[in-house]
Every structure is written in C-alpha cells, then in structure tokens.
C-alpha cells in the first residue's frame, strides 16, 4: 500500500491535524487495503478518486463517486479494496503532450483548435453529462474540434465539471455528436485521473481501438464500470441539453 497524508495546519501548532493524520496513515498502511490512498481527517480515500475540496477545513478531501476505503474513529474499519488480477506491473512511461481544456461560456474554438498540432491527447471538462456549445449559428461550436482531433488521431476524453456522477455521452445531442466523431467517455473519472490515464494510454497503446478500450475500462478503480452504450455508442434519440 501507498498512503499519502498531510495537514491543514503545521505540526508545530497546537491545533494541528498533522499528528493524527500521520498516525492514521501509518495504521492504514498496516491494516488497510493494498492501494494508493489518501488518509485525511480520519478518512481513507482511494487516491485516484479523491479531490481537494476545502482549503480552510480539516475535512479537506472528498471522494464523491467512490465509497471510503476506511474510517478511523474510536475503531478503525477498512474496506477490502480492489481484487488484484494477476501480478502488479509498474507502468513508468507517460506521454506528457496532453492538455486539459475546461469548457466555459464564450470559449473561442480557435484556441483549442490551435493546440491540436501541439498535443497528442486532450481531456475536455464539459458541462453536466457531457455538454458543450454545439450550435454553429452562434459561432462557438466545439464540434469541429472533435472532427479535427479525430483526423489527427488525437484522442479527446470527455469528463464532467460536476463533482458527483459522471459523463453520459449518449444522453444529449451534443454528447452523441461527440461520440460520432470519436470522443471517449471519461465516465465519472476526475479530470486529474483522466489526464494521467490518457498519458499512460498514449504511451503504451498506439492502436486507436486498443487505446480507447484502455481509457474507458476501469483499471485500478479510477472509474465506475458502465454499460457499453455509455462509453461508445450514441443513443438513437438524444435530448437537447437544457
């Protein structure tokens, strides 16, 4: 196991949370599941699911889409963790030429289009279930970005700006259009997890289909397994985002 921790207040201060966090982290490493995790404020989180959500509170982390791996109160209780399939392998190679793009009102599509020649992969933080500007009459449609990325063999992984739940590209018209242009659903991965997984997928998988399977398949609990239509097949009737 690899257990990371820290504190909101320095160890030398009277009300520091550092001492208890360190004790809990050591106990989690000895008795908890053999995973990469974060121990903070008497909670053990799966590392690739956790988000820093607070700056000035002791409960600084959250894992909205994944149950806790452990709670450390008067008694410490731990989940069994992931079942390891086969021997562990350390994958050290990462493709660093990736970019995280957050959709925002008024985003000029020319900006991400200019990035495409410089990157090998793109993570798109979309609205809600995977929405983004689609109407070309408004001058800010991102659909040409997906088309150009596909032509350049630059995978685009779509994740949600919402912390809870995840992307379902089959749900609305814009998501279905992105799927038709080769976009990959990031499900309920955090943007950070999606970036690292994309970096690894690009480093180890040159074939487009193999890369897509890798990115959309849970490897170490970084995403919730979803039905196949959520990942790769546009719905026959998709709704317009409202």
Language model region names:
Residues 1, 31-35, 40-41, 95-98, ...:
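Short coil/turn connectors at secondary-structure junctions
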Residues 1-4, 110-116, 126, 145-151:
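N-terminal small/polar loop signature for handling phosphorylated ligands or for N-terminal nucleophile
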Residues 1-10, 177-182:
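Glycine/charged-rich beta-loop-alpha catalytic/anionic-binding loops adjacent to active sites
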Residues 3-6, 37-41, 102, 125, ...:
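Short beta-strand segments
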Residues 4-73:
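Internal gly/pro-rich beta-alpha loop/helix module
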Residues 18-21, 108, 142:
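Amphipathic coiled-coil/heptad-repeat helices and related helical stalk/stem segments
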Residues 46-135, 218-242:
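Accessory alpha-helical/coil subdomains and C-terminal extensions
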Residues 129-242:
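C-terminal non-catalytic interaction/assembly regions of soluble proteins
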